[in-house]
Amino acid sequence: MTQQSILFIDRDGTLIDEPKTDFQIDSLEKLQFEPNVIPALLKLKPYYRFVMVSNQDGLGTASFPQENFDKPHNAMMALFKSQGIEFDEVLICPHKPEDECDCRKPKIKLLKKYIDKKLFDPTTSFVIGDRATDVQLAENLGIRALQYDREKLNWDLIVEKLLPKQTALLDRKPRYAEVVRTTKETDIKVQVWLDETGMNDIKTGVGFFDHMLDQIATHGGFRMNVYCKGDLWIDEHHTVEDTALALGTALKQALGDKRGIQRFGFVLPMDECKAECTMDLSGRPYFKFKAKFKRDKVGDFSTEMTEHFFQSLAYTLMATLHLKTKGDNDHHKIESLFKVFGRTLRQCIKVEGNELPSSKGVL
């Protein structure tokens, strides 16, 4: 059977509002849908199957009678169906945490069929839910999570992440590159879509580094996948360095002959950190860096690797790159550098016409 792209979606707090008083939807009066959930699911419907997965504490007991659950739940399902939204299955754990069952999220017994029969494609399936247990469920399934939040990651934003959006001009071929780099220390694959926004898939084994790479793509206005298996039992040096080399190569290949690009970029955002970036996709690598860090590590990432990452990237991107930042918090200083680099790169790769931005006739 062909593996499918499936969204495993939480119910309370994700599809419908969860009352903060008793955390039970046990009457029609309590049934309220999350903002824009129906338009969002309709947009996602052509690309994904839907499976609802929910913990319902004490369902079927005196504390939560079955009939009290059924009435609003059936009304919710009927409304979804009337709007063209159907779920392949609705999977519910009725137990309380103290019951220590095997089916309560983040445990995976409810989804055993999907695992044993390999019904979902782990590269294109997601868990969507508002709780940390939903994120943990995704980890247990080996897929990615989108932790729903009405402000930070609402249904409109989820659609933006899950459905890549083409940004290329109508008369231009979308710019894409894939680079595979294998050495004795690392095995890396980088895919870059310069004219597409959406969900980035980044797995290097270094959590903080993954987050920083995502900042580059997000603020750069493009999409990328980065997969790296490195010798992390030694340290993260080879992983970070080789990823930078592969990413720079992929960006350079995706840019092609650079015809029509803006080429130059400069950003100076003012936040709690003052980060500054100047870049020229000149075809001549040059790098200058100014930042001081008080700590040796931020999470699992060595602060000294920040400079080395950008130096390696500038070398294979064949770019002139100046970076500096000031601030009090090392986490924020490093993040400001990755963000400002992404924003500057966004300017440089923007297509403005069809002319080559160089008097030499080549970049």
From Swiss-Prot:
GO terms for biological process: L-histidine biosynthetic process. Its main location: cytoplasm. Keywords: Amino-acid biosynthesis, Cytoplasm, Histidine biosynthesis, Hydrolase, Lyase, Magnesium, Metal-binding, Multifunctional enzyme, Zinc. Mg(2+) binds at D10, D12, D130. NCBIfam families: HAD-SF-IIIA (TIGR01662), hisB_Nterm (TIGR01261), Histidinol-ppas (TIGR01656), PRK00951.2-1 (NF002111), PRK00951.2-4 (NF002114), PRK05446.1 (NF003937). Pathway: Amino-acid biosynthesis; L-histidine biosynthesis; L-histidine from 5-phospho-alpha-D-ribose 1-diphosphate: step 6/9; Amino-acid biosynthesis; L-histidine biosynthesis; L-histidine from 5-phospho-alpha-D-ribose 1-diphosphate: step 8/9. It catalyses: D-erythro-1-(imidazol-4-yl)glycerol 3-phosphate = 3-(imidazol-4-yl)-2-oxopropyl phosphate + H2O; L-histidinol phosphate + H2O = L-histidinol + phosphate. It comes from the Bacteria. The lineage of its organism: Bacteria, Pseudomonadati, Pseudomonadota, Gammaproteobacteria, Pasteurellales. GO terms for cellular component: cytoplasm. It comes from Pasteurella multocida (strain Pm70). This is Histidine biosynthesis bifunctional protein HisB. Residues 175-363 are annotated as: Imidazoleglycerol-phosphate dehydratase. Zn(2+) binds at C93, H95, C101, C103. In the N-terminal section; belongs to the histidinol-phosphatase family. Disulfide bonds: none annotated. The active site is at D10 (nucleophile), D12 (proton donor). InterPro entries: HAD-like_sf (IPR036412), HAD-SF_hydro_IIIA (IPR006549), HAD_sf (IPR023214), His_synth_bifunc_HisB (IPR020566), HisB_N (IPR005954), Histidinol-phos (IPR006543), IGPD_sf (IPR038494), ImidazoleglycerolP_deHydtase (IPR000807). PANTHER family: IMIDAZOLEGLYCEROL-PHOSPHATE DEHYDRATASE, IMIDAZOLEGLYCEROL-PHOSPHATE DEHYDRATASE HIS7. HAMAP family: Bifunc_HisB, HisB. It is found in: Cytoplasm. Pfam families: Hydrolase_like, IGPD. Its cofactor is Mg(2+); Zn(2+). One of its GO terms (molecular function) is imidazoleglycerol-phosphate dehydratase activity. Residues 1-174 are annotated as: Histidinol-phosphatase.
